[in-house]
């Protein structure tokens, strides 16, 4: 029997501290007990739907919605093991996750490796000035060299992605340019350029000028724009987002996640 190809998303709409320039709907604050209960509820949801989706084959898995790494590493490992035991998952299905840089550490990496996470999208937002420290209660900027050249580079895989903001008032044109250049100088395989939201947002013309300059710099460095504002080294394009853009059905679990299946869209 031919299986129906789908992509899967686990939605974690949580963030430790929401920055003013973030337009996404997120739950602010770190509550370990709450997050664990959320994972247990998601596990029940996955189990309950498995039989009805037995004719589907998962081509890619995305852990997103917020900073997915705010979830305990062992809980994420539990969810991914459950998915592989209850669902048909393609052997080469990538697993990508949106992460706060501070969570790429010795406590979590063993669980991420066991979960076969293939790429970590680090929420940096800006490298000049460094902005990701606003995502947590501590300033983790001193860990940056350790993060990028330690665990991830030692992986010897194309496993590091960056998330950068464009169109932000407090980041000058030259600061944004420097941030993009840093992407080209580090072992980064994927880049998402996210539009700044809220009061910190530049007007459309200035924001577009930053995008145009980024496009030139990234193209010169060998990156390819495979979807709007998503850049990758050749062969490192994101299968999840490609599937979504090409109309592939989406199995989604978690708060505010939307599923697209057989022409119907439902939201949790």
Over which residues does each language-model region extend?
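Short cysteine clusters
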Residues: 15-22
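C-terminal scaffold of the Radical SAM
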Residues: 5, 13, 26-52, 56-268
